[in-house]
Swiss-Prot record:
<dbReference type="GO" id="GO:0006015">
    <property type="term" value="P:5-phosphoribose 1-diphosphate biosynthetic process"/>
</dbReference>
<keyword id="KW-0067">ATP-binding</keyword>
<dbReference type="GO" id="GO:0019634">
    <property type="term" value="P:organic phosphonate metabolic process"/>
</dbReference>
<keyword id="KW-0808">Transferase</keyword>
<dbReference type="InterPro" id="IPR008145">
    <property type="entry name" value="GK/Ca_channel_bsu"/>
</dbReference>
<dbReference type="InterPro" id="IPR027417">
    <property type="entry name" value="P-loop_NTPase"/>
</dbReference>
<dbReference type="GO" id="GO:0005524">
    <property type="term" value="F:ATP binding"/>
</dbReference>
<comment type="pathway">
    <text>Metabolic intermediate biosynthesis; 5-phospho-alpha-D-ribose 1-diphosphate biosynthesis; 5-phospho-alpha-D-ribose 1-diphosphate from D-ribose 5-phosphate (route II): step 3/3.</text>
</comment>
<keyword id="KW-0547">Nucleotide-binding</keyword>
<dbReference type="GO" id="GO:0033863">
    <property type="term" value="F:ribose 1,5-bisphosphate phosphokinase activity"/>
</dbReference>
<comment type="function">
    <text>Catalyzes the phosphorylation of ribose 1,5-bisphosphate to 5-phospho-D-ribosyl alpha-1-diphosphate (PRPP).</text>
</comment>
<dbReference type="InterPro" id="IPR012699">
    <property type="entry name" value="PhnN"/>
</dbReference>
<feature type="binding site">
    <location>
        <begin position="9"/>
        <end position="16"/>
    </location>
    <ligand>
        <name>ATP</name>
    </ligand>
</feature>
<comment type="similarity">
    <text>Belongs to the ribose 1,5-bisphosphokinase family.</text>
</comment>
<protein>
    <recommendedName>
        <fullName>Ribose 1,5-bisphosphate phosphokinase PhnN</fullName>
        <ecNumber>2.7.4.23</ecNumber>
    </recommendedName>
</protein>
């Protein structure tokens, strides 16, 4: 049974690495695809593999209804393409890299989605943000403040601890995705 699995978490929680690890483990196991995001950020900016768009191209796509979900964060625009609807209609479960701030809109558009909040202690967030070298000290502090923001509560919200070894946590996320896909349950 197809499901939309909405992964979210603060910068530095390890979403990109965790999703990449889970994707490797699910490659031949399940009818699951991982959606790419359209972002107004250069393709070589590091982090996830995404489709880089100019602001003008993003706005054009947005105005034509080509995004199933979209939001703004940290000075960039993010979109998830409408292709996810076709994938789910064909029986595939879809994993998306979402935003905590956009969860409410995502739940309105896809009430059956499974929201998964990637959670790590603040000291690990600080270490990871510093190690990736994309932000200065002030930007790191701002991201840590934002990390404390409340998440829209959803009855099926899964809080996923990502403070352990990547291989172990990636396997656990792959297991959650596989269980959700096979059983059709939300949690």
């Amino acid at each position: 049974m197809s499901k939309l699995i909405y992964i979210m978490g603060p910068s530095g929680s390890g979403k990109d690495s965790l999703m990449a690890e889970a994707r490797l483990r699910l490659a031949a196991e399940a009818p699951v695809v991982f959606a790419h995001r359209y972002i107004t950020r250069p393709a070589d900016a590091g982090g996830e593999n995404h489709v880089a768009l100019s602001r003008a191209e993003f706005q054009l796509r947005l105005s034509r209804g080509l995004f199933a979900l979209s939001w703004e964060s940290h000075g960039f625009a993010y979109g998830i393409g409408r292709e996810i609807d076709i994938w789910m209609e064909s029986g595939l479960s879809v994993v998306v890299n979402g935003s905590r701030g956009a969860l409410s809109a995502a739940l309105q558009a896809y009430p059956e989605l499974l929201p998964v909040l990637i959670d790590v202690p603040e000291h690990i967030l600080r270490e990871r943000l510093g190690a990736r070298g994309r932000e200065d000290a002030g930007e790191i502090e701002a991201r840590l403040v934002r990390a404390r923001m409340a998440v829209v509560e959803a009855p099926e919200l899964v809080r996923f601890d990502n403070s352990g070894p990547l291989a172990e946590r990636g396997q656990a996320l792959a297991g959650l995705i596989l269980e959700t896909t096979i059983s059709g349950r939300k949690s």
